Amino acid sequence: RDLARFGEMMRRRGVGADGRQVVPGWWIDDINEHDSSAAWARGDFAELFPGASYRSKWYQIDRTEGVLCALGIHGQWIYIHPEAELVIVRLASEAIPLDPDHALSWRRGFDAIADAFL
C-alpha cells in the first residue's frame, strides 16, 4: 500500500492523502516538464518505450498523456496516469532483472486499464 500511496502523492503533485504538501509541487513539475528524450532515443531502452524520456529516477513513457513510471529490478512498477486518476503498483520477483517482453506486456495492460477509466 505504501508504494501506491507514494504514487498517488506523485500524481497529486506532491500532496499526500491527508492534504498536506509532502514534497514541493515544482519538484514533480520538474520531472514532468524537463526531459532527456533526445538521449533516450539513442539509449538501450528506446525500442521498449519509444518517445519516452527519463528524469530523476522516473520514466515518462507517454509524454502526451503524462504517464509516469518508476521501474525497479525484477518487474517492480509504479504506473501513474494522471488523466485517468490512476496509480498501479506491481510487486514482482521475475527471474531476470529486466525482461523487455514482460515489461511491454505489463505496460500494455496498464494502458488498457487506464483507457477503461477515461
Regions found by a protein language model. Name each.
Residues 1-15, 76-77, 81-92:
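Active-site-proximal alpha-helical segments within enzyme catalytic domains
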Residues 3, 24, 51, 106-110:
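A structural signal for well-ordered alpha-helical scaffolds and beta->alpha junctions
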Residues 4-11, 28-32, 57-59, 114:
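Non-transmembrane alpha-helical segments in soluble domains
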Residues 14-24:
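Structural helix-adjacent loops and short alpha-helical linkers that scaffold large soluble proteins
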Residues 20, 51, 98-100:
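Intrinsically disordered, low-complexity regions enriched in Ser/Pro/Gly/Gln/His and often acidic
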Residues 29-87:
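Active-site Gly/Thr loop motif
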Residues 94-96:
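A short acidic/small-residue loop/turn micro-motif
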Residues 100-118:
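Short, gly/Ser/Thr-rich active-site loops of penicillin-recognizing serine hydrolases
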